[in-house]
Regions:
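Short gly/ser-rich loop at a beta-strand->alpha-helix junction or flexible surface loop bordering the NTP-binding
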Residues: 1-178
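Surface segments flanking catalytic/ligand-binding clefts of nucleic-acid enzymes
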Residues: 134-135, 139, 145, 149-230
Length: 230
């Protein structure tokens, strides 16, 4: 799901939906679908309610859900499958990555940027759609260019969440694995970031010394009112 939330909408729109009804019970044919091959990549992480739902081990990495998550933890997509909400995605990550990695993921979800590197086929389709004007100017996320005008893997978009949203969800999800780590990450965010570099700098300056930072209190992109003299 974290990979899904990194995909620009203009890229998703180039791909057909997945028809799960035409596949066998283990969904073995899913691995050859363009959405999986080009965008999501196997193994796909999925939540199951019983061990019998594990499916193909080469295609899926299944995680057993032992407790009902908060309402709104799943979202329908236009491509024939559901994904965990941004908040629930972060909670699932919390039990599997380090605290600093989780904090970086929270910054990206709450930031005005995403990191997405198109594969060769995706880039070709995107270039063709733009040249044929199938994708209008200023449609979807804005791709950032380097100093030479070349495309980068950084995209500008509106934030998916706020730290307040994460904290509220963590309270609702009390008892689920990863809640403590998610609370920690939300408490150590210093505001909205616009790039991975801003995230790294924020963490280096603001995290406690025993966490590898300088322990300095900061607020990202805080508005500073100027006097008439200024």
């Amino acid at each position: 799901a974290f990979n899904y939330y990194r995909i620009p909408p203009q890229v998703l729109g180039l791909y057909p939906a997945i028809s799960l009804g035409n596949m066998d019970r283990r969904c073995c044919g899913l691995g050859s679908h363009a959405v999986v091959k080009d965008l999501l990549h196997a193994p796909l992480h999925r939540l199951v309610f019983t061990r019998a739902q594990s499916g193909s081990r080469s295609l899926f990495k299944s995680h057993l859900l032992t407790q009902e998550p908060p309402p709104g933890s799943f979202r329908q997509t236009e491509h024939g499958f559901d994904v965990t909400s941004p908040e629930f995605t972060l909670l699932n990550l919390a039990a599997k990555v380090s605290r600093n990695q989780l904090l970086m993921a929270c910054y990206e979800m709450c930031g005005s940027f995403a990191v997405f590197k198109p594969c060769e086929r995706t880039q070709q389709q995107l270039d063709e759609a733009i040249s044929l004007k199938f994708i209008p100017p200023n449609c979807g996320w804005e791709r950032v260019n380097d100093t030479k005008g070349n495309d980068t893997n950084l995209w500008k978009r509106t934030p998916l969440l706020t730290a307040t949203d994460i904290t509220a969800f963590a309270k609702q999800a009390a008892g689920l694995r990863g809640v403590k780590q998610l609370h920690w990450a939300a408490e150590h965010m210093t505001g909205q970031a616009a790039s991975p570099f801003e995230v790294q700098t924020s963490m280096l300056i603001s995290l406690p010394r025993d966490e590898g930072g300088q322990g300095i209190e900061i607020a990202n992109n805080a508005r500073i009112p100027l006097s008439e003299a200024a």
